[in-house]
C-alpha cells in the first residue's frame, strides 16, 4: 500500500491524506486551508474521478471543506462518516459554499469599477449539494467493508459531535496491516460529548499534534470564569462578543450559560439576552438536539432524563436574517453575542467586531484555538488596530480568553492516547500541527521509544511486509507572503512582546475595583515574571 500526505502537515488546516491499497484509492479527509498557508498543499496525484471514496473524521471545514470542489472536478465515490458527521456536513458544506459565492460576488462588484477580470467561486451551492448526496452515515464501532481487502471502523474520539478516529484494516497478499488515523483528539470532560476512546492495537498511527508542545494546565471552573467576565462587562454597560465555531463550541457555551442563569451567577442584569447570530450555529444546535442520546456523556443524559434541555434557557435569542443581525447592535441593553467564524476570518462576527472593538466597555472573548495569521490570533496577541471592511478600527475593548477551553487534547492528552497502544506501533506519523510543534512532538515520542516522524506535504510512503519506506520527500519550501515594511516590523517577535505588554496593561485596567486579595495575587505574579526577565 502507499500513502501520500497532501495537507495539514506542519500546519493545522487542510487535512488530506491519500491511501492507495488493495486496488483502491481513498482520501482520509479533504479539508480546506484556513488563514494564510505556511506550506502549499499538494495537488491530489490522481484524477478525482479515480478516487473510490473519502473517509471523513469529523465535520469541521478544515477536514471536509474541499469535498464540493472534489465533486465539481469529477469525484463520484462515496463519502463515509458517522451519522452526526454526515448531518453536520449537510449544513456546514452549504454554508461554506454560500461564503464562496458571496465573496466572489463581492470581489466582482468591487472589480467592475477597476476593470478587473471576474472571479469564479471555488465551488457553488450546487457543488455542495452534490457532495452531500454522496455521504453515507454509520454508527460508531461498526465494521464496514469498503472493498475486498479494506475494512474500516469509526470510534468516538471526543472532539466534536460525531468526531472519530478511523481504524483501517488492509489485507494484501494474505497479510493484514492495521492503520489508525486519530482525527482530532478531544479534550477531557467537555460538556455534552464523550471523552476520547483509547485504542489498543495498530501497526501504523497517523495522529494530530495541535497542542503537542503545551499543556492546558489545571482545568478552570469555566462557568465561574465566564460568569465573572459577563458580570464585569455588563456592569460597565458593555456587550460580550464571542467569536465561536458554530458547531461544537457554540453549544458548549450555551451549556455553560444555562448553568450560569440557573444558579443566578450574574446579578443586577435580569434575564440578560444571549444572541446566537449565525444561521449555521442555529442549524447545528438543532442537530445536537435531534442526535441520538448514545452520542452524549453521562451528565448530559442525566439532564435529559430530568426533562432539562442542556442548551436552552430564558433569554436565548436567534437571528437568522441580515436585518435581525444588524438590529443586535442597535439595542443598547448589555448582551452576549455569539457569532461565527471562530477565528474571525469570515461571517457575521466581523460586523460585530466592527461595532464593538472600539468600545472600552465591551469585551471580546475568545473561546477556541486561533491559527497563525488569522484576525483572531492578531487580536489575542495585542493588535492595537485592525482593518474590517476597509475601515481601520482601534482596539479598545477588553480582549480575553477562556484558557484551556479546547476541543483538542493537550500534550498530556495526546501522550495518553498514543501510549494506549500495546505494543507500540511500528511507526507514528505526526500530522495536523504548526511547523515547530510537529517537530517537538515527534521528538517527544522518539524520546519515549516510539519510531516517529513528521512528514511534509507531498511526502509519500510505501507500507508492506518489509515495513514503511519513504518513496518521496515532501516539500519544505515556505510560501512567501508579500507584506509591507510596516507589517513586516509588526510581525517580529519583539513586536509581539510589546503587544503582549500593552494587552497586560489593558487587563490591569479592567481589573480596577477587584477584590484586594485577587489584585495582590495578580501583582505578585507580575512582579515574579519581571524578576525572572529583568536582566
For the regions a language model picked out, list residue spans one by one.
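His/Asp/Glu-rich metal-coordinating catalytic cores
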Residues: 1-55, 60, 64, 71-252, ...
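A polyampholytic, Gly/Pro-enriched intrinsically disordered region
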Residues: 100-105, 292-305, 387, 469-492
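Short, surface-exposed amphipathic charged segments that create phosphate/polyanion-binding patches used
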Residues: 150-154, 287-295, 415-417, 465-475
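A general structural motif
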Residues: 185, 218-223, 312-324, 343-345, ...
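Short, compositionally biased "basic patch" segments
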Residues: 191-206, 293-300, 370-396
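Hard-cation-handling environments
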Residues: 229-374, 386-387, 422, 437-439, ...
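Generic long, charged, amphipathic alpha-helical segments
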Residues: 387-418
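Charged, amphipathic alpha-helical linkers/stalks
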Residues: 458-518
Amino acid at each position: 500500500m502507499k500513502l501520500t500526505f497532501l495537507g495539514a502537515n506542519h500546519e493545522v488546516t487542510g487535512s488530506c491524506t491519500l491511501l492507495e491499497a488493495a486496488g483502491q484509492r481513498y482520501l482520509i479527509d479533504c479539508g480546506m486551508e484556513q488563514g494564510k498557508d505556511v506550506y502549499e498543499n499538494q495537488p491530489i496525484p490522481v484524477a478525482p474521478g479515480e478516487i473510490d471514496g473519502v473517509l471523513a473524521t469529523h465535520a469541521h471545514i478544515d477536514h471536509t471543506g474541499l469535498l464540493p470542489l472534489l465533486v465539481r472536478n469529477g469525484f463520484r465515490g462515496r463519502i463515509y462518516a458517522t451519522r452526526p458527521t454526515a448531518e453536520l456536513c449537510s449544513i456546514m458544506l452549504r454554508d461554506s459554499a454560500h461564503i464562496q459565492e458571496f465573496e466572489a460576488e463581492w470581489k466582482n462588484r468591487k472589480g467592475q469599477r477597476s476593470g478587473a477580470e471576474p472571479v469564479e467561486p471555488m465551488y457553488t451551492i450546487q457543488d455542495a449539494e452534490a457532495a452531500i448526496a454522496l455521504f453515507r452515515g454509520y454508527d460508531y464501532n461498526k465494521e464496514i467493508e469498503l472493498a475486498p481487502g479494506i475494512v474500516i471502523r469509526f470510534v468516538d474520539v471526543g472532539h466534536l459531535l460525531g468526531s472519530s478516529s478511523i481504524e483501517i484494516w488492509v489485507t494484501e497478499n494474505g497479510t493484514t496491516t492495521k492503520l489508525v488515523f486519530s482525527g482530532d483528539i478531544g479534550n477531557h470532560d467537555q460538556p455534552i460529548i464523550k471523552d476520547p476512546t483509547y485504542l489498543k492495537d495498530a501497526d501504523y498511527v497517523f495522529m494530530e499534534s495541535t497542542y503537542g508542545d503545551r499543556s492546558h494546565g489545571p482545568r478552570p471552573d469555566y462557568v465561574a470564569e465566564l460568569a465573572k467576565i459577563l458580570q464585569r462587562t455588563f456592569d460597565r454597560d458593555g456587550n460580550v462578543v464571542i467569536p465561536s465555531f458554530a458547531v461544537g463550541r457554540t453549544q458548549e457555551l450555551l451549556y455553560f450559560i444555562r448553568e450560569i442563569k440557573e444558579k443566578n451567577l450574574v446579578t443586577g442584569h435580569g434575564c440578560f439576552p444571549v444572541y446566537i447570530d449565525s444561521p449555521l450555529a442555529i442549524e447545528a444546535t438543532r442537530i445536537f438536539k435531534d442526535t441520538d442520546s448514545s452520542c452524549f456523556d453521562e451528565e448530559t443524559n442525566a439532564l435529559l432524563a430530568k426533562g432539562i434541555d442542556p442548551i436552552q434557557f430564558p433569554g436565548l435569542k436567534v437571528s437568522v436574517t441580515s436585518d435581525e443581525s444588524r438590529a443586535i447592535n442597535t439595542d443598547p441593553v448589555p448582551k452576549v453575542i455569539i457569532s461565527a467564524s471562530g477565528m474571525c476570518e469570515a461571517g457575521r462576527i466581523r460586523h460585530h467586531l466592527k461595532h464593538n472593538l472600539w468600545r472600552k466597555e465591551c469585551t471580546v472573548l475568545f473561546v477556541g484555538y486561533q491559527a497563525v495569521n488569522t484576525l483572531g490570533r492578531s487580536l489575542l496577541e495585542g493588535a492595537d488596530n485592525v482593518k474590517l471592511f476597509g475601515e481601520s478600527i482601534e482596539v479598545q475593548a477588553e480582549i480575553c480568553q477562556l484558557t484551556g477551553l479546547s476541543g483538542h487534547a493537550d500534550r498530556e492528552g495526546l501522550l495518553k492516547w498514543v501510549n494506549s497502544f500495546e505494543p507500540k506501533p511500528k511507526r507514528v506519523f505526526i500530522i495536523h500541527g504548526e511547523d515547530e510543534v510537529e517537530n517537538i512532538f515527534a521528538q517527544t515520542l522518539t524520546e519515549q521509544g516510539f519510531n516517529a516522524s513528521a512528514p511534509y506535504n507531498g511526502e509519500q510512503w510505501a507500507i508492506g511486509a518489509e515495513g514503511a519506506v519513504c518513496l518521496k520527500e515532501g516539500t519544505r519550501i515556505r510560501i512567501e507572503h508579500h507584506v509591507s515594511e510596516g507589517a513586516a516590523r509588526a510581525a517580529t517577535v519583539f513586536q509581539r512582546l510589546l503587544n503582549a505588554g500593552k494587552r497586560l496593561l489593558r487587563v490591569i485596567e479592567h481589573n480596577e475595583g477587584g477584590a484586594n486579595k485577587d489584585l495582590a495575587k495578580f501583582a505578585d505574579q507580575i512582579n515574579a515574571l519581571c524578576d525572572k526577565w529583568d536582566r
